[in-house]
A protein has these predicted regions:
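NAD-dependent ADP-ribosyltransferases
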Residues: 1-255
Length: 255
């Protein structure tokens, strides 16, 4: 029996230069702050989303507001939203993240797959391609910046993430010995939960794992996003990137 949370494929849609880099084993991590700025500057609500990173939408008299103000201090960002207050950590905006479309067995069938062969047909939502491709191809001429995509074999992708974890752990241990202090450099990966209703009340406990980075609005469920991120690292600027090199994907890994 195949576990329902096993992945079937991974798809990455981006500029040609970033796809080429990924196939060569170079993962480029951006951050939520960049996507928020992109949404505000261009109106792109597919890749950009100004609602990203919020961990709570609470009524103004909610006692948890006082608790969060005391706990997070200057890291807390508050935005009025009618009778509610939206809460976001400033530090969440610069956590390095890598986003990819991940299709799981549970997505293909209503219940866990049984033994034997199963034929799966999956139609990618047109919004994935239309919004990205129209924006890039209509405004950018350079070939390496045109929109394209790659579909990766699930096991091969998972192996690269395991390799990334090993590499980052070794780098952290070396730095820890050099600086003689305890350090952390975790590589976390999980599927996005599309459970945020922007008109309702919600609260995600803001721990050091930055769980708010794994929640998005319900309307984005068609993106089937899996996110890899470094909760212990922060980029110096929202337009900076963190790069991690692992083994390249050979032709057998590309679907």
């Amino acid at each position: 029996m195949i576990p329902p949370d096993n992945y079937i494929i991974f798809l990455k849609f981006s500029e040609q230069r970033w796809i080429d880099s990924l196939v060569n084993g170079n993962f480029s991590f951006s951050c939520v702050g960049k996507f928020i700025q992109q949404a505000q500057a261009t109106g792109d609500t597919v890749q950009g989303d100004s609602f990203k990173g919020y961990f709570a939408r609470l009524k103004k008299d909610d006692k948890r507001l006082t608790i969060m103000r005391s706990r997070l201090k200057d890291d807390l960002e508050e935005s009025n939203d009618g009778n509610y207050v939206l809460l976001r950590r400033k530090s969440a905006l610069t956590v390095p993240i890598f986003c990819i479309y991940g299709y799981q067995c549970i997505d293909a069938v209503n219940e866990a797959p049984s033994s034997g062969k199963t034929r799966i047909r999956h139609n990618f939502d047109a919004r994935l391609f239309d919004a990205f491709a129209n924006k890039w191809n209509s405004s950018i001429v350079a070939d390496d910046r045109r929109a394209t995509y790659v579909i990766l074999q699930a096991r091969a992708f998972a192996n690269r993430i395991a390799e990334m974890r090993d590499k980052e752990l070794k780098n952290m241990l070396k730095k820890q010995r050099r600086e003689r202090k305890a350090l952390a450099n975790r590589v976390l990966a999980d599927r996005i939960q599309y459970d945020i209703d922007e008109r309702g009340e919600f609260f995600i406990n803001p721990t050091d794992n930055y769980p708010e980075l794994l929640h998005k609005r319900c309307e984005y469920a068609y993106q089937y996003e899996t996110r890899i991120y470094f909760p212990d690292i922060h980029l110096s600027h929202i337009f900076d990137r963190k790069s991690v090199a692992v083994s390249a994907f050979d032709k057998s890994c590309l679907l």
